[in-house]
């Protein structure tokens, strides 16, 4: 069974969509999967079982990235096309069946609307597939003999960020004397281009307790470290 799975550009929305992808994999062990998504989300799909290809949809002028997707997929016959972006060009692919988001129910959570695409009665919980390298790296980076507090102090938009002094105060309360994670190490996560923002906070973390992972590991390794 050949599946084209068109999902989000945003990382968070793409992760939510992994729930129905996992359900399809469990229901169809012989599934052969092609995934189309934005560049930020692409790394989380690298180890999906039965993956044939990840098509990265870099945004182009006049929405030409959709035409590019059509050109890459038109020569295949798809047993199932799932399009969570509702791109009109996916209607023009050779396929047996196509499922899309349709009109979202504003009274429901996004994850509920995604689960309804394949007619699930319950919400499909997100699923990430890490590799052996990611699992091993997490064991090396995250100590098992002390508590660890994970902090993600950055964002892609400054208005979304919390001030570094607030994070510093939170760390002091949580890991200080009588805190719920007393003397914990602090693992700091973020993208490489967000490093200057993260450094402001990391400089305030006591020596020997900061685990600096900002821009140093892949998304799948971030997942295994947090697990």
Where are the predicted features?
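Catalytic machinery of carbohydrate-active enzymes
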Residues: 1-227
């Amino acid at each position: 069974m050949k599946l084209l799975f068109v999902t989000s550009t945003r990382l968070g929305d793409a992760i939510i969509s992994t729930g129905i992808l996992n359900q399809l994999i469990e229901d169809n062990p012989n599934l052969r999967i092609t995934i189309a998504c934005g560049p930020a989300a692409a790394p989380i799909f690298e180890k999906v079982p039965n993956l044939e290809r990840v098509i990265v949809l870099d945004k182009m002028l006049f929405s030409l990235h959709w035409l590019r997707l059509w050109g890459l997929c038109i020569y295949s016959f798809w047993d199932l096309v799932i399009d969570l972006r509702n791109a009109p060009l996916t209607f023009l692919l050779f396929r047996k069946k196509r499922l899309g988001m349709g009109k979202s129910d504003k009274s429901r959570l996004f994850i509920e609307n995604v689960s309804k695409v394949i007619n699930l009665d319950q919400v499909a919980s997100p699923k990430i597939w890490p590799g052996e390298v990611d699992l091993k790296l997490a064991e090396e980076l995250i100590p098992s003999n002390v508590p660890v507090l994970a902090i993600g102090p950055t964002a892609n938009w400054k208005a979304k960020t919390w001030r570094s002094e607030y994070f510093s105060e939170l760390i002091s309360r949580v890991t200080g004397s009588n805190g719920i994670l007393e003397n914990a190490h602090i693992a700091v996560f973020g993208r490489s281009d967000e490093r200057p923002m993260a450094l402001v906070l990391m400089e305030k973390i006591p020596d020997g307790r900061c685990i600096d992972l900002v821009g140093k590991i892949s998304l799948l390794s971030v997942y295994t470290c947090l697990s």
